[in-house]
């Protein structure tokens, strides 16, 4: 039998106006990094692949329907090592405290879907749009 999270608990976990939650834990200017290689099996560790790009995100806004969204992220130049983007990590503003990670793909099958090619050359620009995080509740 599955564990079900109530909507009120979902809102509190992600950070509604009454509780700090994940939104406050993430902070004002979190970093999103894209890497080559697979997502690390250890949720506490960074990927073993090569760092492709680092993006500074805007603070996540107020929760709406269990979702918080960061809009107007910066676009950063790719590091000297190009490659195939395959995973990502979200870090606090200190650029070292890991919050979560996932896989990346071009069309489907990834936790983040890229609009452009997953293969990028050295010195290319990887553009970042909005990032939404959703905390599911009930049977979602």
Describe every region a protein language model picked out:
Residues 1-88, 92-140:
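Small cysteine-rich, disulfide-bonded extracellular modules of the LU/uPAR three-finger superfamily
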